C-alpha cells in the first residue's frame, strides 16, 4: 500500500469513527431526553458531550479500533464486534475529555482544540466540574450497554478504572510539585518529571487504547500486557516531552491552544532541561521570572530557553528517543505484531500539534 492509499484508509477509518459519535450520544441520551424528572439534566449531558468530546485528533480512540482490527482475524470482525471496538475507542476519548475539562480549570486555560474552554463559556464556570463527572460516568454506561455480555467486560472495567487512578496520581504529583504561588525550582528534577509523565500521560494515552484492544481480542496474559506496557510507557514519555515543547514553541493556530506552562509554574521538560544547563546567573533569572503571570516575565523565561538553545536540545532528544523506541519495539513487541507499535510511534514522531 503506497502513502496515498494509506492516507485514504486512515481518513476513511477516521470518518467511520467520527460518524459513530452520533450513535454514542443517542445511546447516552435518547431514551431519557423527555424524562419528566431527568430530562433537563440529559439535555445538559448532550451539550457537554457535543462540546467537549469532539474536535481533537482522535488518536487514542482510533488506536483502539485499528489495533482491534489488526489483532482479530477478519472473519471474526462482524458488524457487532466492530461497533464495540468503535464504542470502546469513544470511551477512551470520553476519558480524555473528562481529564481535559478539569485540567483546563486547574491550569486557568483559555482555549482548547481551537475553541474557548468549556468552563470559560458564559454561564458555565465551576459547574464544569460536575459536567466532567458526567463525561466519566458516560464511559461506564457505554461499557455496560455494549460489552456487558462479553468475556472481556470485567477486564475493560478494571482497565478504565486503573487508568483513571494512574492519571489522577500523575496529576497529584504535578500539582504538589508546583503548588500555586510557590516556585521551588529544586523540585524540578528529571526523576520527578519522569514520574509525572508516566502516571499523568503514558498510561491513559498509550497503554489504555492498546490494552483495551488486546483484551477485546482475547489477549489477557500478564507477560503480553507487561511487554506492551514497557513500550507504551516509553512512547508516552516521548509524547509528553513533545507536548511540553509545543506548549511554548508550537504554533497556536496549529496546536489549537495557547500554552501556559511557564506562568502555571509547571514541571515541564523545558524547565528541567534549562536547570540542567543554566549557569548560576541564568538560574537566578529563572528564579525571578518562572511561575508568574506577568507577560514580561514569561518572555524573559522564553528568552532564556532560546539562549540555551533548547529547541536544538529537543530535536536531538526527539531523534534519539525515536531510535530507542524502535529498538525497544524490536525486542519487546512479540507476540504482538511490531507494526501496532511502529504505526503509533510514526504517528507522533515529528508531530507539530
UniProtKB/Swiss-Prot annotation:
<dbReference type="GO" id="GO:0045542">
    <property type="term" value="P:positive regulation of cholesterol biosynthetic process"/>
</dbReference>
<keyword id="KW-0007">Acetylation</keyword>
<dbReference type="GO" id="GO:0009410">
    <property type="term" value="P:response to xenobiotic stimulus"/>
</dbReference>
<keyword id="KW-0756">Sterol biosynthesis</keyword>
<keyword id="KW-0414">Isoprene biosynthesis</keyword>
<dbReference type="GO" id="GO:0033574">
    <property type="term" value="P:response to testosterone"/>
</dbReference>
<feature type="modified residue" description="N6-(2-hydroxyisobutyryl)lysine; alternate">
    <location>
        <position position="57"/>
    </location>
</feature>
<dbReference type="InterPro" id="IPR033749">
    <property type="entry name" value="Polyprenyl_synt_CS"/>
</dbReference>
<feature type="binding site">
    <location>
        <position position="103"/>
    </location>
    <ligand>
        <name>Mg(2+) 1</name>
    </ligand>
</feature>
<feature type="site" description="Important for determining product chain length">
    <location>
        <position position="98"/>
    </location>
</feature>
<dbReference type="GO" id="GO:0005777">
    <property type="term" value="C:peroxisome"/>
</dbReference>
<feature type="site" description="Important for determining product chain length">
    <location>
        <position position="99"/>
    </location>
</feature>
<dbReference type="GO" id="GO:0071398">
    <property type="term" value="P:cellular response to fatty acid"/>
</dbReference>
<dbReference type="InterPro" id="IPR039702">
    <property type="entry name" value="FPS1-like"/>
</dbReference>
<dbReference type="GO" id="GO:0061051">
    <property type="term" value="P:positive regulation of cell growth involved in cardiac muscle cell development"/>
</dbReference>
<keyword id="KW-0153">Cholesterol metabolism</keyword>
<dbReference type="Pfam" id="PF00348">
    <property type="entry name" value="polyprenyl_synt"/>
</dbReference>
<dbReference type="InterPro" id="IPR008949">
    <property type="entry name" value="Isoprenoid_synthase_dom_sf"/>
</dbReference>
<feature type="binding site">
    <location>
        <position position="257"/>
    </location>
    <ligand>
        <name>dimethylallyl diphosphate</name>
    </ligand>
</feature>
<dbReference type="InterPro" id="IPR000092">
    <property type="entry name" value="Polyprenyl_synt"/>
</dbReference>
<comment type="pathway">
    <text>Isoprenoid biosynthesis; geranyl diphosphate biosynthesis; geranyl diphosphate from dimethylallyl diphosphate and isopentenyl diphosphate: step 1/1.</text>
</comment>
<dbReference type="GO" id="GO:0070723">
    <property type="term" value="P:response to cholesterol"/>
</dbReference>
<comment type="pathway">
    <text>Isoprenoid biosynthesis; farnesyl diphosphate biosynthesis; farnesyl diphosphate from geranyl diphosphate and isopentenyl diphosphate: step 1/1.</text>
</comment>
<keyword id="KW-0443">Lipid metabolism</keyword>
<comment type="subunit">
    <text>Homodimer. Interacts with RSAD2.</text>
</comment>
<keyword id="KW-1207">Sterol metabolism</keyword>
<dbReference type="GO" id="GO:0033384">
    <property type="term" value="P:geranyl diphosphate biosynthetic process"/>
</dbReference>
<feature type="binding site">
    <location>
        <position position="200"/>
    </location>
    <ligand>
        <name>dimethylallyl diphosphate</name>
    </ligand>
</feature>
<dbReference type="GO" id="GO:0004161">
    <property type="term" value="F:dimethylallyltranstransferase activity"/>
</dbReference>
<dbReference type="GO" id="GO:0005737">
    <property type="term" value="C:cytoplasm"/>
</dbReference>
<feature type="modified residue" description="N6-acetyllysine; alternate">
    <location>
        <position position="57"/>
    </location>
</feature>
<feature type="binding site">
    <location>
        <position position="240"/>
    </location>
    <ligand>
        <name>dimethylallyl diphosphate</name>
    </ligand>
</feature>
<keyword id="KW-0152">Cholesterol biosynthesis</keyword>
<feature type="binding site">
    <location>
        <position position="103"/>
    </location>
    <ligand>
        <name>Mg(2+) 2</name>
    </ligand>
</feature>
<feature type="binding site">
    <location>
        <position position="96"/>
    </location>
    <ligand>
        <name>isopentenyl diphosphate</name>
    </ligand>
</feature>
<feature type="binding site">
    <location>
        <position position="107"/>
    </location>
    <ligand>
        <name>Mg(2+) 1</name>
    </ligand>
</feature>
<keyword id="KW-0753">Steroid metabolism</keyword>
<dbReference type="GO" id="GO:0046872">
    <property type="term" value="F:metal ion binding"/>
</dbReference>
<feature type="binding site">
    <location>
        <position position="113"/>
    </location>
    <ligand>
        <name>isopentenyl diphosphate</name>
    </ligand>
</feature>
<keyword id="KW-0479">Metal-binding</keyword>
<feature type="binding site">
    <location>
        <position position="112"/>
    </location>
    <ligand>
        <name>dimethylallyl diphosphate</name>
    </ligand>
</feature>
<feature type="binding site">
    <location>
        <position position="107"/>
    </location>
    <ligand>
        <name>Mg(2+) 2</name>
    </ligand>
</feature>
